[in-house]
Amino acid sequence: MVAVAGEIGKGGIPMAKAWHLTSRPQGLPTIDNFALREVPDGPLEKDQLRIRNLWLSVDPYMRGRMNDAKSYAASFQIDQPMTGGAIGEVIESRMEGFAPGDLILHMGGWRDGGVIGLDMMPNKLPGDMLAAGLTPQTFLHNMGLTGGTAWIGLLRVAAAKPGDTIFVSAAAGAVGSAVVQIAKAREMTVIGS
């Protein structure tokens, strides 16, 4: 059976499909390190949303999470659904401030949908920005984790100001390229590698 988020599975239980890490990659990950499996969706409890994912983010930091090593982000657990940034549509809500049809950014990605709670940090996409022409996917990069990391690192941590000269290592990477764009827009001189 091919399940779609919210589809009824065996025994009348709603099902979703989620990617699971089945083994730790040695070098580059291969399809053999992953499995797409059905996961029970269940009825909603307080502070939960049933969502249908529209876009998933695949970010460089996720490769590090496939290792069993201490890092700034917790390792993916073997045979458990993988998480990551995603844009989803709310199908059903028992969480204050969220209604069916809302588009959200959350960390319960790598699945077609399902039930998420507050631990997956759902945030409603700003309707005014969507109406102004920003696409929902923008909130997975420059208006999301990537852009937020660049913004905070450059303007709050480094406290860079117009006229400063900054050096950006990995200027071609996701966060580095966002730092370069923000710095140039704020009239800084950028040296990148």
Regions found by a protein language model. Give the residues of each.
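A short N-terminal beta-strand-loop micro-motif at the entrance of redox/enzyme domains
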Residues: A3-G9, P25-L54, P81
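Short structural boundary motif marking the start of a folded domain
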Residues: G12-W19
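Residues that mark the start of a beta-strand
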Residues: K17, Q48-R50, T165
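Glycine-rich beta-strand-centered segment in the early N-terminal region that forms part
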Residues: P40-V58, M66-W110
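NAD(P)H dinucleotide-binding glycine-rich loop of Rossmann-like/cofactor-binding domains
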Residues: G84-E89, E96, P100-A170
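Gly/Ala-rich phosphate-binding loop of Rossmann-like dinucleotide-binding domains
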Residues: A150, V180, K184
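N-terminal Rossmann-fold NAD(P) dinucleotide-binding loop
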Residues: G176-S177
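Adenosine-nucleotide cofactor-binding segment
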Residues: K184-S193
